[in-house]
A protein has these predicted regions:
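C-terminal catalytic histidine-bearing segment of alpha/beta-hydrolase fold enzymes
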Residues: 8-81, 281-284
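Serine-esterase "nucleophile elbow" of acetyl-processing enzymes
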Residues: 81-131, 145-150
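Oxyanion-hole/transition-state-stabilizing segment in secreted/luminal serine hydrolases
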Residues: 52-53, 57, 61, 137-176, ...
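Solvent-exposed loop/turn segments at secondary-structure junctions
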Residues: 53-58, 94-97, 132-137, 161-167, ...
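Catalytic His-Asp segment of secreted/periplasmic serine-dependent ester chemistry enzymes
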Residues: 203-285
């Protein structure tokens, strides 16, 4: 597809006219062609850009996430470097292991595949998962001690806590052990806290299964867990990705729920990855 055809295809989604005005620019070794469309949705102009350089092409509209935009410019100038093997570690429970979905459907696998698609063919990505259905924070701590993972990962994700809530564990256990898990996770990326992504806890109240367990109380309790994790991350400067609202659409959008009526589906995990990916691209270097 030509650059103009690609731009017009993108603009079509905004009900724009098909007569773009283009402007060619250079940014260092990059060639940037920018298209501007008028008469679009809500009478606003939108822009679409094609970036080319070092054998890599990145195209995006003006609503592109800033992290992705920055990454696009850097990766496009990175064509001569040596091949790399990026290592990803995913820590958690059933939401990380992908209960009731296929192995390639769970969010860590989808994230790995998206990263592979964004990087040069010569690069490799490997994934290790330490997670199991039913694990609470104590279980994950013990499993990490047993597994003795290496400390040279390039990216770590942490999603944990739903079973503390479901099993009725004292909240102060989560408060203590969440911080300990964060510290352990950071140690596995060479003590570089910027390489950690904490993911919020899904809300299972909005599933057929969750409707049987006082869903109003469930949601309220999970708010406490997620608020604590978010505030902890904000206080120490960690990345936190909120995906809970996606799962809160599970009753009105059944395709977000797996066949067991409880866990997220492949489709839901794809939506998780859409939010995680921009941060992952900025962190994996």
């Amino acid at each position: 597809m030509s650059a103009q055809a690609s731009a017009e295809n993108w603009a079509l989604n905004f009900n724009c006219n098909m007569t773009p005005t283009s402007q060619n620019k250079t940014w260092g070794t990059l060639a940037v062609k920018q298209y501007t469309f008028g008469s679009c949705l809500d009478n606003q102009k939108v822009r679409y850009s094609i970036v080319e350089g070092a054998g890599h092409t990145a195209d995006y509209g003006e609503n592109i996430d800033l992290y992705s935009l920055i990454w696009s410019f850097f990766i496009a100038t990175d064509g001569d470097r040596a091949a790399r093997n990026y290592k990803i570690l995913a820590l958690g429970d059933s939401y990380t292991i992908g209960e009731s979905v296929c192995d390639t459907c769970r969010f860590p696998e989808q994230l790995k595949e998206r990263l592979i698609s964004e990087y040069a063919d010569r690069d490799e990505f490997s994934l290790q998962i330490i997670a199991q259905t039913g694990w609470n924070t104590t279980d994950l701590k013990n499993a990490m001690t047993t597994a003795e993972p290496a400390n040279n990962f390039d990216l770590v994700t942490l999603l944990i806590g739903v079973n503390n809530q479901f099993q009725g564990k004292p909240f102060d256990v989560y408060e203590t052990e969440f911080g300990e898990l964060v510290d352990s996770a950071i140690s596995l990326v060479g003590d570089d806290a910027s390489k950690l992504i904490v993911v919020s806890i899904p809300d299972y109240a909005f599933t057929p299964f969750g409707q049987n367990f006082n869903p109003t109380a469930t949601s309220a309790e999970l708010v406490l867990y997620n608020d604590f994790a978010r505030e902890y991350c904000e206080a120490v400067g960690l990345s936190y990705v909120y995906i809970t609202d996606i799962t809160q659409q599970g009753l009105e959008t059944p395709s977000l729920v797996a066949s067991d009526g409880l866990h997220p589906s492949e489709f839901a995990y794809t939506k998780f990855v859409e939010r995680i990916l921009p941060l992952a691209l900025a962190k994996v270097d």
